[in-house]
Amino acid sequence: MNNNFSSMIDRYKHQQLQIGSVSPQQISAWATKILPNGEIVGEVKKPYTFLYKTNKPEKEGLFCERIFGPIKSGICACGNYRVIGDEKEEQKFCEQCGVEFVDSRIRRYRMGCIKLACPVTHVWYLKRLPSYIANILDKPLKELEGLVYCDFSFARPITNKPTFLRLRGLLKYEIQSWKSSIPLFFTTQGFDTFRNREISTGAGAIREQLADLDLRILLENSLLEWKDLGEEENTGNEWEDRKAGRRKGFLVRRMELVKHFIRTNIEPKWMVLCLLPVLPPELRPIIQIDGGKLMSSDINELYRRVIYRNNTLTDLLTTSRSTPGELVMCQEKLVQEAVDTLLDNGIRGQPMRDGHNKVYKSFSDIIEGKEGRFRETLLGKRVDYSGRSVIVVGPSLSLHQCGLPREIAIELFQPFVIRDLIKQHLASNIGVAKSKIREKEPIIWEILQDVMQGHPVLLNRAPTLHRLGIQAFQPVLVEGRVICLHPLVCKGFNADFDGDQMAVHVPLSLEAQAEARLLMFSHMNLLSPAIGDPISVPTQDMLIGLYVLTSEKHRGICTNRYTNCNIRTLQTKSSDYSNSKYKNPYNNGPFFCNSYDAIGAYRQKRINLESPLWLRWRLDRRVITSRETPIEVHYESRGTYFEIYGHFLIVRSLKKKILFIYLRTTVGHISLYREIEEAIQGFSRAWSSDT
């Protein structure tokens, strides 16, 4: 619709859409078409839609059949009919009305254009934050707005000869007669000549400044200024330092914008429109409802508003030679506001409303949001080989795996299962294979497992706001009717397990499967594409689980003063400490020789997850060389003694040799330590195998 749309379509293989600025020549190429008789059509000149009496599109109007194609396939405006695609038919268009004999579906993608009487800035580039026009020109946004909406003008002598304003500025004294002569130029027939020579205002002034920019020189100057600011030391003045910091941030954004323009071969002056594209009629329809009433898209009314004001401005500039200059500038402002409303209604303040006080839906309103063209119409469509279900946590899954319910998996991979059934001579034809699938024979699940083994699936959670909204996983069959998801990938999807739903898609072609494996697998997207920080980090449920796992009740020895873990627990029938597994005459002070015994006791429900316990530990140099003073020392009759510290205990012999070390811990800490240890060992093995 605007000069931001550029569609590149490969009719044989791919379809893709690119959004960016395009040149007026490209807009003209989209809209204009040369008829077989040599006539050029494509410009929409009239603000009318249909003739009231005949219900036929107005010629050169918003629904003109000469510009956009016939309403009915093969039928022109006169009512003549030709067979589409018939090579025997010599005449491809009607000589009387100038309508081509083509398929009516052409009205869905053939565009038109409006030739604007004055340049108009694109409101997305001017008013959206950050303002690209203000950034690249390095001027305040309010100053540019005042210039665009004709609130003021600036002198711009475009020749080396002395002009009226330049000569006036060179003189040291004021000539009173000049003051009275200036307004005369705005009411005479020579106003256009005077304005074009002496002053500049409106979007044309912005376009001239953008056209004069040399992007590479601008990039070099911005880089030099940024380096100079970086070399300056702090002045000690907080306000000045903040000002310099803001300037550096602005220069970085400006350089990124200039690099984008250079990389994509976009000229900055294209941000100012001279031609306004007109959407195909099928995308802004007029529908007749019961009772003969017509329902029209709001876009049509906004287009009519633009054409009315543009035609008025054209008449003022061409036919009325004695038009006051102030009236011309006022009309240019109205054209600018009409285009702003068409592109983004309400961006400048109060939105435009119809007779029923309803806000008009502009182009931005149509494409943005949850109910916009992209998210609802394009991304929200139901497609083949896809399913949808609620997500739940899958703690036993690997990072690259997802749990797929049997009911969904058999439907998604049914063609592949049928192919393997016939290939293995387990079914004679497709009908027999489908019958086996409906009966859910055991062989079906075995074949399904083999099919899924090397076939990734794509999981998507709406809204898809960035690249990590769609990721690839290796499917694993699970029971139930919900999709199981590893909790570490939730942040990329912005998902949680409170009822969120996700869609699953099966990539069919080899290219799609290769793309999923090489670029989209979850274990290959561990960093945020925006800022580079880790995105696969524990969140929500995992943080709560880690908190519960590592919570403790009176873990320190000083807290319970040995009442829950009497040191004499170590004195058992045998003095062989290495064979003692579970020796606890008290309720809360068990001693364990290894972590397996502690976890086994927890599984037998003999101890709790957060209950303190003593775990025999290997001789740790950090413990041996610790300078911590023992809280108490217990001596035994056999000569051994026990040094009791805050979180560990040392058993020494008569010769002060360390026999055993016991750590004060919980089952939760033991489990977390074992998981971390196994992960590090697995990483070390993978690293050694690669090297």
UniProtKB/Swiss-Prot annotation:
One of its GO terms (cellular component) is DNA-directed RNA polymerase complex. Its main location: plastid. Zn(2+) binds at C76, C78, C94, C97. Pfam families: RNA_pol_Rpb1_1, RNA_pol_Rpb1_2, RNA_pol_Rpb1_3. Binds 1 Mg(2+) ion per subunit. Mg(2+) binds at D496, D498, D500. One of its GO terms (biological process) is DNA-templated transcription. GO terms for molecular function: DNA binding; DNA-directed RNA polymerase activity; magnesium ion binding; zinc ion binding. This is DNA-directed RNA polymerase subunit beta'. It comes from Cuscuta exaltata.
